[in-house]
Amino acid sequence: MDPKKIARINELAKKKKTEGLTPEEKVEQAKLREEYIEGYRRAVRHHIEGIKIVDEEGNDVTPEKLRQVQREKGLHGRSLDDPNS
């Protein structure tokens, strides 16, 4: 997210605590917060999709649901053609 938008979120939060927001500012704040949260969720999802879990013996113990997502995206050498990957 653009640093200017983050600064605006913080500015509106501070103003809300000190003097309150106008109805227009409340709408702006809600839109900016939603945009920020959506970007954060995308980043976390992307990070989790890139994780491969192995046990102490080196065996892949990644949950099947995550493996399926990785197969669809071709991550970690997983392939839709090989259900054991």
From Swiss-Prot:
Predominant cellular place of this UniProt entry's protein: cytoplasm
Keyword Cytoplasm: yes
Alphabetic keyword roster: Cytoplasm
Gene3D superfamilies assigned to the protein according to its UniProt record, in alphabetical order: Helix hairpin bin
Subcellular localization, as worded in the UniProt entry: Cytoplasm
One cellular component term from this protein's GO annotations in UniProt: cytoplasm
Region annotated Disordered, chain positions: 62-85
SUPFAM superfamilies: YnzC-like
HAMAP family: UPF0291
Family of this protein: Belongs to the UPF0291 family.
Protein name per UniProt: UPF0291 protein SPD_1303
Organism: Streptococcus pneumoniae serotype 2 (strain D39 / NCTC 7466)
